[in-house]
Every structure is written in C-alpha cells, then in structure tokens.
Amino acid sequence: MSAELIAVYKDEQIIDLESAKVLGLSDGIKALKGTEPIYFDDSPLALEVIRHSCAHLLAQSLKALYPDAKFFVGPVVEEGFYYDFKTASKISEEDLPKIEAKMKEFAKLKLAITKEVLTREQALERFKGDELKHAVMSKISGDAFGVYQQGEFEDLCKGPHLPNTRFLNHFKLTKLAGAYLGGDESNEMLIRIYGIAFATKEGLKDYLFQIEEAKKRDHRKLGVELGLFSFDDEIGAGLPLWLPKGARLRKRIEDLLSKALLLRGYEPVKGPEILKSDVWKISGHYDNYKENMYFTTIDEQEYGIKPMNCVGHIKVYQSALHSYRDLPLRFYEYGVVHRHEKSGVLHGLLRVREFTQDDAHIFCSFEQIQSEVSAILDFTHKIMQAFDFSYEMELSTRPAKSIGDDKVWEKATSALKEALKEHRIDYKIDEGGGAFYGPKIDIKITDALKRKWQCGTIQVDMNLPERFKLAFTNERNHAEQPVMIHRAILGSFERFIAILSEHFGGNFPFFVAPTQIALIPINEEHHVFALKLKEALKKRDIFVEVLDKNDSLNKKVRLAEKQKIPMILVLGNEEVETEILSIRDREKQAQYKMPLKEFLSMVESKMQEVSF
C-alpha cells in the first residue's frame, strides 16, 4: 500500500484522485503535467490528505452514534485534525474510545470516497435545515461546492481526500474541548474532538511516544517540581510569579545576553510602562491593536499600558539630533509588556498577559539593512547553538495591503534575502505574509521532541519612522528618514524558558542551571567545610546550594537528582581532610574525584565555555 498514489501536488495545491476525475481528465490524475506525485506514506503532503479523510471518518462515526449531530468544520491542523460539531447528547473524553472503535468499523468496510460538485443553490438544498453547513457556505465565495461521500455519509468539503476508507488504519483521538462557532465568543459553543493519523503503525507509535514524553516535559509540571515559577488566582490569570530558582535561571540568560549585546554595539535604554494614548494613536496601535491593550486614566488623560517597546525606543531616538555618522543606532531593552489574551488561550509561560521581551530596535540607513540583518543572523546562530536548538527561517514578503513604493519593498526584501544567503541559511518564503509596513524574517526553533516553535522576529519597518517623522542628516546635509529594524531573538523570556525547559526536560545545561552544584555534607562536622566551599563557588558566580537537612545521605542525593542539579558533591571525612572532592557529574554521567583547586578552576572554565 505504501507505493499507492493518492494525490498530486501542483501549483501549491493538493489535487486528489476524485478531484482529477471531476476536472474531466480522461486518464485521471496521470494526465496532469508538471506535478509532484503524493504517495501513501508519512510525508507531510500525504499526511494532510490522510488526516483530512480521518476527520471525515470521525464525523461519519459521530453521525452514526449521535444521529442528531451537525457539523461545522473539520480541518487539518499542525497537531493533526479536529472536527467541530454539536449534539444534544453529552459527550466527554470517556466517550473517545467508543467513537474511535466506530471509526475502525467504518474503515474496515473499505468505503469508496467519491466527490461531486454542486452549485450554491444545490448545496443549500442538499444541506437544508443544517444551519452549521449554511454558516460554512456563507463564508465561501463562488458557485462551486465540493461534496465528498463515503457510504451514507456526505460532507461539504473542498478536499483533498483519500480514495477509500481502507487506508485509514493508524489513528488516535487525542482530546475533547469546547470551541465557539467560528471562534467568536458571541456565538454558541460547539464540541471539538482532536485526533491524529498516520500512514504507518510506526508513525503513530512514534507520535504517541512523543506525546507521553511531552507530558513528562511539560514546563508547567517542571515549573512546580523544580520551583521555577507559579501562578496565583488572587493575582490573576496569565501573570507569572518567578520563584528564586526560576529567577536565577532567567537572570543568567539576561546577563549573558546583555554582555553579548554590549560587545555588539547595542546601548541599553528603558521606556515607561504606560504612555499617553496620543502616542498610540500616532503609532497606529490605538486603531489596529486596541483590543489587545490595557488602558487607564490619569488626571483625565487616557494612557495605554505598552503592548510593545517600539514607541519608547522611538522617543529615545527623538531625544537628540542624529547624522549619518551616528548610524546605525542599536537600542535594547528587556521590556515588560502587557497584552490582553483571552483566558482560553493562556498556557503556562507560553501564553501570558505580562511578559518580558529581549527587544531591540536598530535605526539605520537603507543601505545598512543587509549588514545589520546579517549581524542579527550571526547573533541568532550563536544563541541557538549555545542552547542546542536547530532552527529555520521564514521570509515573509509584501502583502496585498501595504504602504510604500514597490522599489523600496523590493530593495528591503532583497537585503533580507542577501543576508540569509550570506549565512548560507535555507529559508522558506511566505508570499504576502509580511506586515503592511515591511518584510520580516521569522525564527522557528526545533526542540528535542522535533516540535517547531515560533520565537524571534527580524522586522524591517518603513511605517513608524514615517508616522513619527524620524530623520537624520545625510552626507549631503539633507534630512533623510531612517529605517527601523525590530529585533527579538528569544521572543520573550517567558516563552523561551518554557521551550527551554521542555527541550531539556528540566536538565538545564550547567551554564544556566538554576542550581549548578549541590553540596551534601554527610554530617554536622562536615558542614563548615561545605559553607566554605559554597562561598568559594559563589565568588565564581556559581549557583550553589547546601543540602543540610537532617535526612539520610541517600535521601539528600535523591533530592538533588530530582532537582536535576548538574553536579552533586558529597562531603565526608576524606573530602574535608584531603580536599579531594567526590563529584557526581550529570552531564558526563560519571563519578570522579578531583582536587579542590582543580575543581574550582574547572567550574570557572565551564562558565566561560558559552558566549553569544
């Protein structure tokens, strides 16, 4: 079955076998020229077809089990597929095995999946009395509506789909949730069931293993177990509390970045947390981003709590006159921002209402865009390398609605492409995916579980400099508008630390571990030596803890291991008398002895191994 053709890819579109027949191709799909064949396997294009058909298999099974069920949409998404529907029956996650069993029954029937195309009038008549399908049709322009059938079940859909349910053997329903119709909170709540599907048994097995591993590595779970952060309902949702260990981890990353930023010619700046609404009106945030902002009134004047740091940095730029000799100007700030996120999307540190960006804005001439972006790419590579992340870049180009001259856009986009080319970085292009004011590069990192995360962005901005009338004096002594480059590599410390926690499963590398060394005195008489060693390590900027509770040695060692501390030193008579230390090294997965002076020298060296 693995060699069977299920569709082709042509002009950035998947065309399935049934669609080829509907197109009137006498030889079916083989008559299509200039296409990439899609075979039944676990490749991304094949999985899109497989998962789309599995969504229909889910809907067919739901209809059989709950005859009053009505269906909205069932798309393929990054984590598999889902279907939104409603029924008078009460459904919980306990019902998923029953639904899954019914899906397997239909799959074994080897039902042919066929397609027909209806006019709008025909489609409205076909789904008469189905308000959810009518809602779907109201969002579709044109007069052609695809309808796929398998057995007695049919559904409005543009495809693509498999030719038969016999292909669907390796799937799993993963969770049940609620979802507002069309994502609008003013509409009724529907039921959403998620699932995953693969061509092969191995693909499903590997995925389910990753899901279980992801549960173990969930940063919310690790945050509690390792004492990194917490949330408190009395404070409010989406507002994290950084506990001492988490704050130590975060500060270490901040300090490493600050050192690197200063060496790279960035200047630290700091803007206020609240700014008059007048300035948000100039920037365009008031008209285009107001629903995501928080506002307050002071002395009858409206203020907006900043959702971004760019306006503050613009005002820093405007605080002095500038000539071409001053450029580029690189300002950075660990800026605390607030954004109104709906409670349903809040998720640990990954999605919060208050967060801190590793934000920087570069003011430069148009000719300096490429060199500045190139330097940012170099910086990005060093950071990702230090944290053992692989990453990819995506270049987003001019959208249909945008400002600025075509030549300016072409030049700016070309500068980004040349910078990527200079660093030999393979990148994807998101045509039309840029902001209305300039092209951008998105940084997407891949973690240990092969999940991709959107983190940093490099954004060329030709809009805000114009709105705020920014200028510098050029070589001809004329006023010229600078380009503004928005740049955040981590994205936010909260999000990055969440991803970092899951990437390492809490086993942070030595240079950022919230506790790097645990000292375990065997009994009271070894405590003085432990405190002396602790002070020596603290002077070397090492995060160290003495585990001196009245517990057994084994219990203290297990505690240190549970806390995922990279180095554990057990201190007894021999260590105190000889000053030769017994070290349990997590990274080396070894136990060894080392003289005290040599050990102190080693940890100093380890702290110097990583730089950005």
From Swiss-Prot:
| Binding residues annotated for Zn(2+), in chain numbering | 310, 361, 486
Paste the cofactor note: Binds 1 zinc ion per subunit.
Top-level EC class as recorded in UniProt: ligase
Q: Which GO terms describe its cellular component?
A: cytosol
GO molecular function (one) = threonine-tRNA ligase activity
CC cofactor: Zn(2+)
The record's annotation in Pfam families points to: HGTP_anticodon (PF03129), tRNA-synt_2b (PF00587), tRNA_SAD (PF07973)
Family annotation (InterPro entries) = aa-tRNA-synt_IIb, aa-tRNA-synth_II, aa-tRNA-synth_II/BPL/LPL, Anticodon-bd, Anticodon-bd_dom_sf, Thr-tRNA-ligase_IIa, Thr/Ala-tRNA-synth_IIc_edit, ThrRS_anticodon
Record EC number:
6.1.1.3
Gene Ontology BP terms:
threonyl-tRNA aminoacylation
Which keywords, in A-to-Z order, does the entry hold? Aminoacyl-tRNA synthetase, ATP-binding, Cytoplasm, Ligase, Metal-binding, Nucleotide-binding, Protein biosynthesis, RNA-binding, tRNA-binding, Zinc
- Residue span of region Catalytic: 218-509
Which Gene3D superfamilies does this one have? 3.30.54.20, Anticodon-binding domain, Bira Bifunctional Protein, Domain 2, Threonyl-trna Synthetase, Chain A, domain 2
Quote the catalytic activity from the record: tRNA(Thr) + L-threonine + ATP = L-threonyl-tRNA(Thr) + AMP + diphosphate + H(+)
This protein's record includes keyword Transcription: no
User: What family is it from?
Assistant: Belongs to the class-II aminoacyl-tRNA synthetase family.
Protein's job? Catalyzes the attachment of threonine to tRNA(Thr) in a two-step reaction: L-threonine is first activated by ATP to form Thr-AMP and then transferred to the acceptor end of tRNA(Thr). Also edits incorrectly charged L-seryl-tRNA(Thr).
Under the subunit heading, UniProt states: Homodimer.
HAMAP family, A to Z = Thr_tRNA_synth
Q: What is this protein called?
A: Threonine--tRNA ligase
Species assigned in the record: Helicobacter pylori (strain G27)
Q: Which gene encodes it?
A: thrS
